[in-house]
Amino acid sequence: MSRKQLALFEPVLLVQALTDAVKKLSPRAQWRNPVMFVVWAGSVLTTLLTLAMVTGQIAGSALFTGIISLWLWFTVLFANFAEALAEGRSKAQANSLKGVKKTAFARRLRAPRHDAQADNVPAAELRKGDIVLVKAGDIIPCDGEVIEGGASVDESAITGESAPVIRESGGDFASVTGGTRILSDWLVIACSVNPGETFLDRMIAMVEGAQRRKTPNEIALTILLIALTIVFLLATATLWPFSAWGGNAVSVTVLVALLVCLIPTTIGGLLSAIGVAGMSRMLGANVIATSGRAVEAAGDVDVLLLDKTGTITLGNRQASDFIPARGVDERTLADAAQLASLADETPEGRSIVILAKQRFNLRERDVQSLHATFVPFTAQSRMSGINIDNRMIRKGSVDAIRRHVESNGGHFPADVEQNVENVARLGATPLVVVEGARVLGVITLKDIVKGGIKERFAQLRKMGIKTVMITGDNRLTAAAIAAEAGVDDFLAEATPEAKLALIRQYQAEGRLVAMTGDGTNDAPALAQADVAVAMNSGTQAAKEAGNMVDLDSNPTKLIEVVHIGKQMLMTRGSLTTFSIANDVAKYFAIIPAAFAATYPQLNALNVMGLHSPNSAILSAVIFNALIIIFLIPLALKGVSYKPLSASAMLRRNLWNYGLGGLVVPFIGIKVIDVLLTLLGLA
């Protein structure tokens, strides 16, 4: 991935964030965050009190009240700034995507073939179902499916990858994205969306936050923060008559300062920024999430369904051996295997053709000149082959070929069964070749498990995440590779229906399931999974069914997606712990300052030895505002992530952010008190 990463504090972003922070001071904007709305209301009230004191309408220290009011406004501004900075980083990422959208004309065909008559129309007028012709050098005008042709496509504007990709009709690489450019040849594309609904439009809307809604965990935490705010508001409201009855009424300014310091303003001010930054970090990994809910769900996932090919193994299986059945010549097996693979464009199919050529000098033959019919592989049949000169040759998985043989009145030989087991026990994939009802033998396909993947699965296991390998291989091959890779479980001979059933089974047990997919046959399982990462190179159906799209089309990215989701949840939890813990230190600063005149015994709580009641209150309010600024980098970058169990993670958080939340305010408030005293403001 070559997408440029934004620095944490770009000067342009800082200026824009400051401007947006001021704009967010409106009551309508503040009302969306109840905790900060209370601070905003306190700021307005103390500002009015300051003006009244300056004009002599009421008695009191205008300087003290004015400084309190100023720092309350700073508290609101700093919270606005954190949110605006997070949104600004996302908008900057979106601007690079907007540059991809260009006003252009499209060749809309009157019939679904490349030589049909075409009309030049603005790309914005294209509708779902329209057929367009795109030639070399053109920008693809809409999202769609290739129905004819094949071409090299530059998708760097979206994926950040400079290497072109092949898009062609009739397979899992038929999906194209509007805004990408054709480098060679031509494509006939059926538009799959209306204007404003394209993948680019959805990416931009998501990244800019236009479709951002609070996630369930955010809503639950917001309710908790509101409840705490109401409790502290009621408690503070009772303190005025309580102190007045004692003969020394506490001023409204002090009560407002006390309330603001007691309510959880730190997490209240950073909560929105954490959510926006989480989605931004996901985009930084070249993954587009359709909502914050998807990112959050990634953090709660406890079952990963991982395709074997390309995720656990390198995915470049190569034919390495022909093992004929008893009574069959190896050359005969190789010839049949090559014929069955002539029109198979997969790496495995091409390797079979090449191996037959190397072993027995069997030359490739043109399928069309042979007047043969190629039978393509499907997820349901799990075999492919060729019909030629009254010969019906098939190659495929053991079970598929066994059913084929038995349905044609044949018998599956015991020696071939043994050869299949021997190949599978070595971790290779056996393909069986059959002509009619006669089994000819086995092709050995070798694949290599990715380096370091076993250690990554061990880390996931520490975190309580179960890994399940999904493969179309037979159980013996699957078991051998699963043991080598270190996964917890596997699903062998997988079909789309089996994947869907497995996901539902785990969900019925109360688990959250994540998976990847790229084909139309993956769409039902992607739609069912809690976190569904569709490959950008996959079909439109897969991308619509998933709640994330990986622009790099790298199935291994699912593990990184889970890490980012967990980091976002950890960041939110850590800052919540810190916010609530640092309230304790503020009690020791403000409570003695506010009520020591009425109850001298409370001076015993002044463990920090603060200079005066006024300096104590000012120090607490100033610290309350500054801590938001100091925590913005942590909210945007996320806390440092380590794969730990839930209990170990809880202990780490309580130690770092619970104890830190207790200690840091004591130090910070004392330092501010000393500075205020030196400046003569206390």
Swiss-Prot record:
The keyword Cell membrane applies. The keyword 4Fe-4S does not apply. Keywords: ATP-binding, Cell inner membrane, Cell membrane, Ion transport, Magnesium, Membrane, Metal-binding, Nucleotide-binding, Phosphoprotein, Potassium, Potassium transport, Translocase, Transmembrane, Transmembrane helix, Transport. ATP binds at residues 344, 348, 377-384, 395. It comes from the Bacteria. One of its GO terms (cellular component) is plasma membrane. The chain crosses the membrane at residues 34-54, 58-78, 219-239, 254-274, 588-608, 616-636, 662-682. One of its GO terms (molecular function) is magnesium ion binding. It is found in: Cell inner membrane. The active site is at residue 307. Its EC number is 7.2.2.6. Gene3D superfamilies: Calcium-transporting ATPase, cytoplasmic domain N, Calcium-transporting ATPase, cytoplasmic transduction domain A, HAD superfamily/HAD-like. Mg(2+) binds at residues 518, 522. It is a multi-pass membrane protein. Signal peptide: none annotated. It holds the Pfam family Hydrolase. CDD domains: P-type_ATPase_K (cd02078). InterPro entries: ATPase_P-typ_cyto_dom_N, ATPase_P-typ_P_site, ATPase_P-typ_TM_dom_sf, ATPase_P-typ_transduc_dom_A_sf, HAD-like_sf, HAD_sf, P-type_ATPase_bsu_IA, P_typ_ATPase. It catalyses: K(+)(out) + ATP + H2O = K(+)(in) + ADP + phosphate + H(+). Belongs to the cation transport ATPase (P-type) (TC 3.A.3) family. Type IA subfamily. The system is composed of three essential subunits: KdpA, KdpB and KdpC. Part of the high-affinity ATP-driven potassium transport (or Kdp) system, which catalyzes the hydrolysis of ATP coupled with the electrogenic transport of potassium into the cytoplasm. This subunit is responsible for energy coupling to the transport system and for the release of the potassium ions to the cytoplasm. This is Potassium-transporting ATPase ATP-binding subunit.
